[in-house]
Amino acid sequence: MHAPHAPVRPQWLAQVSEAPLDPNRAIIDAHHHLWDRPGQRYLAEDYLADIACGHRLVASVYVQCRSMLAVDRPEPFQAVGEVEYANGVAAYSASGVLGELRLCAAIVGGANLLLGDAVAPVLDEMLQRAGPRLRGIRNTTAWHADPRLISNPRPPPPGILLEPAFHRGLAQLQRRGLVLDIWAYHTQLGEVLEVARTFPELLIVVDHLGGPLGAGPYAGQRDAVFARWSADLRQLAQCANVRLKLGGLGMKVAGFDHHVASRPPGSAALAAVWRPYLLQAIDCFGAQRCLFESNFPVDKGMFGYGVLWNAFKRVVADFAEADKDRLFSGTARETYKIEG
């Protein structure tokens, strides 16, 4: 099995450092993780070190990654430990010790929606432990038959998004006013569309640009993938209940392979290769329904945090101020009900 993500190499990353562009613009990082895995520790202090690069981060959205599970509890309730941990980080930040930054201001937990109606007590306990900071749920759903296209340490089986039990779980999610985050590849956007049409009142956030693939059988097929991804994304955008996270292109499955170079890319280089994807996505959904994300530390194996945000800022430099405000903070604030 291929390692799902490029390894983080601090010395390699340190070769490129940039001053922040548009440094006073408020940013809500709509997607990051914290974990303590063997050889891959990335906790709050590590994230804080990354964001201390001059950009004005005002809040962040923590997204489930099977971190800090309550292993002494029955399996369905182990995911409660993760939201409890993230809420503790958020409480520390909310004390004002980090200035205006509200770390983990919104939390996307990992309750197993395949439990169907039985997920209800898990969701209720998560809400009890994390309170209003619990804003959504995400399950592991990105699947492809090719083993080179694995982006999760625990790959899911196929077809989860269409399972009747999963849909019963979605009904429980909707009943509680929670958001559904979905990470799926571009080959699965038809399944995402079916979910969006089946649950028109459920707010759905599609992660990582809808997963345009560039590795495995899609290596060297970028034009064909872009055409299919664009068409499916435009169809999905017709569902008013769907929003799109812009980012995640530093994963190996995206196929850009910045990690094999002797030096990490600068923001101008990233902007050049990302611009078609970002502009197409924004054209489909509009700035009102798009939100920028770092996907750190997953994408950290390819480029630095400050470089990432400079690349985003370069791509939308000519946008209206109101649209930039939506992309960098407003859409995330509205979607995940972040106060401030």
What do the predicted segments below correspond to?
Residues 3-4, 155-291, 320:
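Catalytic pocket-lining loop regions of alpha/beta-barrel enzymes
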Residues 15-22, 44-54, 117-133, 190-200, ...:
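Short amphipathic alpha-helices and their capping/turn segments at secondary-structure boundaries
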Residues 2-15, 74-188, 194-197, 210, ...:
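Active-site gating/metal-coordination segments in enzymes
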Residues 23-26, 55-59, 99-106, 131-135, ...:
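Short, well-ordered coil/turn segments that N-cap beta-strands
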Residues 25-37, 206-209:
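Histidine-centered catalytic micro-motifs
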Residues 1-26, 42-50, 58-59, 276-291, ...:
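Mid-to-C-terminal alpha-helical segments outside catalytic/metal-binding sites
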Residues 37-102:
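Alpha-helical scaffold segments that flank or form the walls of functional sites
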Residues 31, 60, 86, 107, ...:
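Conserved, mostly hydrophobic/aromatic
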